[in-house]
């Protein structure tokens, strides 16, 4: 059950300035006491974090915004919170970047993307407004961030004329002299789509229509769309809602993430030409709303929300929810998007420990590396009571089992996730950070990203492999040091 059902509308839509200081101090203290709070993942100081927004590389730094509801670990009044970093280890906390302070975003500054141009960051977001009857009025809006970090809004650039009230999450890029924008949209026939708009000046946008693929009946809404080119191919990345599958791997969460690779987008026919079947980048329990951007060296970097809409994790009892994934470089191989943790993260590693069979964890923030040669294995993380989460493999598939954690949640969606094993011989990276696990399998062609909750986690047990490598990991710095 979602906390949204236990809060009144008035409570969920309180603004930051309306939250008593004593409540902020109480939420902060509760979060600080949570042993499950991560040390090397971005998470909120209190309240709820969801979608990454406005990702870009600007003025020598990576800029990361994210959706933030400060009133509590619940979806309500949304702000854009702003961080920057040069190395993903040391961060600068800029505080709130975009506030819901206009009529068109009176009920939240919803998700969107960024484009760097002419020594400015162009920020595109959805203005969320509700009328007296609680009908949603979404618009696509525009702001700029200058080199000194100052942000100015420029109002609405696209009204909703063609879709239901589910019309949000703009992502903009430039191709030649044209600006192109994709927006997550629900058609009037209640199908999910990636709507495309075109502009010459960022002010007047022409509606080109939904991008056509053979998956036009996939779900009832596509959120957080992204469109980019990589290795000469075009990729549609999105988070569809209302999708299920009979096979043992795909679309097992309440909502999922998918991508489609094709040759090029034909702006005349509005089709993604020669596109392949739909694929999933992640087979874990908690992965949603990924967004990508290019850095100064041309790397395509992906960051996702480790969480899901309408699902509450046990951390809500400590007045926080949600975190961002580790940054992952994207490449394209054999038709798959390959995700690789950025090499900058190697700076987090402490001295390597090699263990066999079992090992007592001195730190529950660590990297475990496994070298597979073809056989099955089992890796168990546990406490003295036997509460556990188990990652294992057979000859043909991987499995993540969290049915026996200390604190269960989202049980109606099952406690096991599976992924196909594509190669007998491979190295697996497993990042563990107190209450989150990110597993890179099949050479990065798939990941398994999940939250887990084990009280006093202290042991890792290995079966089926002779040994594993473990690196304790340092924490990132600079979060929560903003004066704003």
From Swiss-Prot:
Protein's cellular compartments: Cytoplasm
Active site: 51
EC number: 3.2.1.26
Pathway field: Glycan biosynthesis; sucrose metabolism
Alphabetical UniProt keywords: Carbohydrate metabolism, Cytoplasm, Glycosidase, Hydrolase
InterPro entries with a match to the protein in the record: ConA-like_dom_sf, GH32_Enzymes, Glyco_hydro_32, Glyco_hydro_32_AS, Glyco_hydro_32_C, Glyco_hydro_32_N, Glyco_hydro_beta-prop_sf, Suc6P_hydrolase
BP GO annotations: sucrose metabolic process
Residues the entry annotates as binding substrate: 48-51, 67, 110-111, 168-169, 223
Main location: cytoplasm
Signal peptide residues on this chain, from the entry's feature table: none
Cellular compartments per GO CC: cytoplasm
CDD domains: GH32_ScrB-like (cd18623)
Triggers of expression: By sucrose.
GO-annotated molecular function: beta-fructofuranosidase activity
Protein origin, superkingdom: Bacteria
Catalysis performed (reactions): Hydrolysis of terminal non-reducing beta-D-fructofuranoside residues in beta-D-fructofuranosides
Pfam families, sorted: Glyco_hydro_32C, Glyco_hydro_32N
Membership in a protein family: Belongs to the glycosyl hydrolase 32 family.
General function of this protein: Enables the bacterium to metabolize sucrose as a sole carbon source.
Name by which UniProt lists this protein: Sucrose-6-phosphate hydrolase
């Amino acid at each position: 059950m979602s906390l949204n059902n236990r809060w009144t509308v008035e409570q969920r839509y309180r603004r930051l300035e309306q939250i008593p200081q004593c409540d902020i101090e109480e939420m902060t203290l509760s979060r600080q006491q949570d042993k499950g709070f991560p040390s090397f993942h971005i998470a909120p100081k209190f309240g709820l974090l969801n979608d990454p927004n406005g990702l870009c590389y600007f003025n020598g730094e990576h800029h990361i915004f994210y959706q933030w509801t400060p009133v509590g670990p619940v979806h309500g009044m949304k702000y854009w919170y702003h961080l920057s970093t040069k190395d993903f280890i040391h961060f600068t906390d800029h505080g709130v970047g975009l506030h819901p302070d206009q009529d068109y975003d009176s009920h939240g500054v919803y998700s969107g993307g960024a484009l760097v141009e002419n020594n400015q960051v162009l920020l595109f977001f959805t203005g969320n407004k509700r009328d007296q009857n609680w009908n949603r009025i979404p618009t696509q809006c525009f702001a700029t961030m200058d080199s000194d970090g100052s942000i100015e809004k420029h109002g609405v650039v696209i009204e909703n004329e063609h879709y239901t009230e589910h019309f949000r999450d703009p992502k903009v890029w430039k191709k030649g002299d044209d600006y192109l924008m994709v927006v997550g949209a629900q058609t009037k026939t209640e199908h999910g789509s990636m709507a495309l708009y075109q502009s010459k000046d960022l002010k007047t946008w022409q509606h080109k229509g939904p991008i056509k693929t053979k998956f036009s009946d996939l779900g009832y809404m596509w959120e957080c769309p992204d469109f980019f080119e990589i290795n000469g191919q075009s990729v549609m990345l999105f988070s569809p809602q209302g999708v299920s599958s009979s096979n043992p791997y795909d679309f097992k969460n309440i909502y999922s993430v998918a991508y489609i690779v094709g040759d090029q987008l034909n702006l005349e026919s509005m089709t993604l030409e020669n596109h392949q079947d739909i694929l999933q980048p992640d087979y874990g329990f908690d992965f949603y709303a990924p967004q990508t951007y290019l850095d100064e060296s041309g790397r395509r970097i992906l960051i996702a929300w480790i969480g899901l809409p309408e699902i509450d994790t046990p951390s809500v009892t400590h007045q926080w929810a949600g975190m961002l994934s580790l940054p992952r470089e994207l490449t394209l191989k054999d038709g798959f998007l390959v995700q690789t943790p950025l090499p900058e993260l190697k700076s987090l590693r402490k001295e390597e420990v090699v263990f066999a069979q079992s090992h007592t964890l001195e730190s529950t923030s660590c990297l475990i590396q496994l070298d597979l040669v073809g056989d099955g294995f089992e890796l168990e993380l546990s406490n003295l009571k036997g509460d556990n989460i188990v990652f294992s493999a057979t000859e043909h598939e991987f499995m993540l089992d969290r049915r026996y954690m200390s604190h269960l949640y989202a049980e109606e969606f099952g406690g096991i996730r599976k992924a196909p094993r594509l190669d007998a011989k491979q190295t697996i990276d497993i990042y563990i950070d107190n209450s989150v696990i990110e597993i890179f399998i099949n050479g990065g062609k798939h990941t398994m990203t999940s939250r887990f909750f084990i009280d006093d986690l202290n042991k890792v047990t290995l079966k089926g492999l002779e040994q594993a490598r473990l690196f304790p990991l340092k924490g990132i710095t600079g979060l929560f040091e903003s004066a704003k």
